[in-house]
Amino acid sequence: MTDGKDLEAEIHPLKSENRKVPENAGALAGKEPRGTPAPQTRLSHCRTAAFFLSLFACLLVVFVVSFIIPCPDRPALQGVWRIDYNAAVAYDFLAAEDVNKDKIQDILFLYKNTNSSRGNSSFSCADEGFSCPCTFVAAVSGASGSVLWERPVAQDRAFVECGILQPRGSAAPSACVVLGRPGSLVAVDTLTGKTLWSQPSSFGGNASVLSPLLRVPDLDADGAPDLLVLIQEENQVNGSIYSGGTGQQVSPPDSLGVDGTSGSILHVTRAGAHYVLIPCGTALCSRSVKGLYEKVSRRDSPLKSDPLWEDMLSAASHRLVVHSSGAIRYLMNVPGKAGDDLLLVSTEAYMLLDGQDLTPRWTFGTTQVLRKPVLGYYKPDTPAVLVENGTGPDRQVLLLDLGSGAVLWSQALPGLPGDPPSASLPTADHRSAFFFWGIHEPTDSNQTEPGAAGRRLYMLHPTLPGVLLELDNVSVPIVAFQVVLLEPGRHAACILLTGPASPSPPGLVSVTKHKVQDLVLAGRVVHLAEGGAESDQAVRDRLSRLRYRSEA
């Protein structure tokens, strides 16, 4: 019988428990007064109340965030916009900066107008002491193309450097510094267009400014980087240092003892010393910023000097020993293994020099180089340089590995005189999309005049090396061209400044923005080799899904 009860208990455990409850009920009732809830019941009620209170609090927070607190307005980005200026001329300058702080890059440019203004500005040439026409700097919204501000800054052609940080406590975080003719140095608040400071320069009437304006370390301790201005007068290059915070001269003009040309750069050696490098024919001229400042100011400088470079520099000619084949056209600081190296571009070769001892790492021979090369990434996180070799029908576009000089990609692509420089934009896969101008016609094409329909913009991505995508066809003169990431990761755009360039007669000047993704979806696919595996639409779809990233 006992075994039978145990078996029944195993089969029906709940029934066994129910039978035991009445037996124990009396004992429990005797120990606890009637009407008093059990401790477990009170705890259960507390837990239930806490659950509903927390649920109510969560719902309240969701309600407040969703319906009461307004979401920040995100400006609607137009795929295409255009702004026109009649009877104007344009200058080769485009810059991108978030002017109105809407987290979208805006566009700054220069133009010279025969009228006092386009009608969007409350300032005329006469308001700033200039005769009509004069040079304006303008900022337009990258989202819509609406004019944010414009202001006259110079009588004639100007050199501009934007993104100059201002001293702490200044009303403006950054400024565009404009050097115009006649010589005047003006800083314009990039947020409002208001003049922060204006200083006359000490340039002679026959002096010519060698662009660009070079940023040097803060020598006057005002919290803003200073500017080195190089001018050429009577076959001599003179240098003056101006405060980036006030425009006042930090050091008066002094001869660098060289007769260089434009295209100078500021190079920092492995020892942290700053040297100005200037193309001087087939040679490379240089002066240390420390030596230039201390010579004219007769004060000590916090800057460093590099004994190795001082030994390499000729005391008489200020020339560095560089064996260049042909006249030097361009100098570029490029990323190296232990600091910046130097890419030297002459009329006959590209040469990568070690950034410290200037020994050649590699040389790539060319026939004729007219444009500055463009840096990018052909392989993931591996720097490459896009170069243009030759001109006209003999032009060739190449991508070289920056570390070795090896050819990664090449394509014959005839060009036209006055084609804009190439551009690149990093993509999310740690490569770059490359943009360049040219004319690609099939071998069976009946077109007798290359480029008769206009200049054509092509796009190349390294994941599709056998395909070019023709994005645009422009028939008007192009003064400046840039590919800009207006919004991180999502909105890349081509910016074109077209019209007559100074000193041509005035005409219609236009600034146009095209969204890259829209151009890709409507682009013409050019197969460089037979037997492409993907259809034209598949190529367009694949390239339209590219995500872009900002420069590191």
Curated annotation (Swiss-Prot):
<keyword id="KW-0735">Signal-anchor</keyword>
<comment type="similarity">
    <text>Belongs to the FAM234 family.</text>
</comment>
<keyword id="KW-0325">Glycoprotein</keyword>
<keyword id="KW-0812">Transmembrane</keyword>
<dbReference type="GO" id="GO:0016020">
    <property type="term" value="C:membrane"/>
</dbReference>
<feature type="transmembrane region" description="Helical; Signal-anchor for type II membrane protein">
    <location>
        <begin position="49"/>
        <end position="69"/>
    </location>
</feature>
<dbReference type="Pfam" id="PF23727">
    <property type="entry name" value="Beta-prop_FAM234A_B"/>
</dbReference>
<dbReference type="InterPro" id="IPR055409">
    <property type="entry name" value="FAM234A_B_beta-prop"/>
</dbReference>
<keyword id="KW-1133">Transmembrane helix</keyword>
<feature type="glycosylation site" description="N-linked (GlcNAc...) asparagine">
    <location>
        <position position="238"/>
    </location>
</feature>
<protein>
    <recommendedName>
        <fullName>Protein FAM234A</fullName>
    </recommendedName>
</protein>
<feature type="topological domain" description="Cytoplasmic">
    <location>
        <begin position="1"/>
        <end position="48"/>
    </location>
</feature>
<feature type="glycosylation site" description="N-linked (GlcNAc...) asparagine">
    <location>
        <position position="473"/>
    </location>
</feature>
<dbReference type="GO" id="GO:0009986">
    <property type="term" value="C:cell surface"/>
</dbReference>
<dbReference type="InterPro" id="IPR011047">
    <property type="entry name" value="Quinoprotein_ADH-like_sf"/>
</dbReference>
<dbReference type="InterPro" id="IPR015943">
    <property type="entry name" value="WD40/YVTN_repeat-like_dom_sf"/>
</dbReference>
<feature type="topological domain" description="Extracellular">
    <location>
        <begin position="70"/>
        <end position="552"/>
    </location>
</feature>
<feature type="glycosylation site" description="N-linked (GlcNAc...) asparagine">
    <location>
        <position position="115"/>
    </location>
</feature>
<dbReference type="InterPro" id="IPR045232">
    <property type="entry name" value="FAM234"/>
</dbReference>
<keyword id="KW-0472">Membrane</keyword>
